[in-house]
Amino acid sequence: MEKGLLIVISGPSGTGKGTVCKELLRNNNFWFSVSSTTRDPREGEIQGKSYYFMSKEEFEDKIKENDFLEYAKVYGNYYGTPKSKVIEMLDKGKDVILEIDIQGALQVKENYKEGIFIFILPPSMEELKNRIIKRGTETEESLMTRFKSAYKEINYVSKYNYAVVNDKVHDAVEKIQSIISAEKCRVDRIKDSILLSKEGIIHEQLYD
């Protein structure tokens, strides 16, 4: 069985990567990896669906037990991707989406180079500011921290395979779907199945 694709989507806070991922999942048979975090839940977030919310002590115990594919500390809180389920789904041939921060994505890229790494960009920095402000969940101090981090994080776009500007969610989703479709046709991903098919054809011609 062919392994599934690991699709890693990240970008600065406010680029709308969460919304993009929701739309991708709505129209495709992807498996979405739910991250663990020590931050407090936001309004409407559900334990086990939005995140696995846990204490700092619980998270650090899981780090010691090597339970994470990647983890990072962002704005004072831990975020991490539980490892075992991701590996299980990939081995079953399921395409897996990780929506993770930039630190975490670069960790995954070190250990899983065959993944597809997609960086979500805002249409402009002004629009990025507006999106973060509209959330209404940040203090003035934390807003400034997020703005400064976003400016720095955009410099990491060159570490990714693809960059997608999220101006309109529908357009961004279509671009990502096109990227995934193209990746599935890459010869280095499908050469084994091509060779098996070729051997089958030769066998038929020789013995039938």
Curated annotation (Swiss-Prot):
Entry keyword annotation includes Glycoprotein: no
Domain of life, per lineage: Bacteria
GO cellular component: cytosol
Keyword Lyase: no
Enzyme Commission number(s): 2.7.4.8
Chief place where the protein resides: cytoplasm
Catalytic activity from the UniProt record: GMP + ATP = GDP + ADP
Full protein name: Guanylate kinase
Gene for this chain: gmk
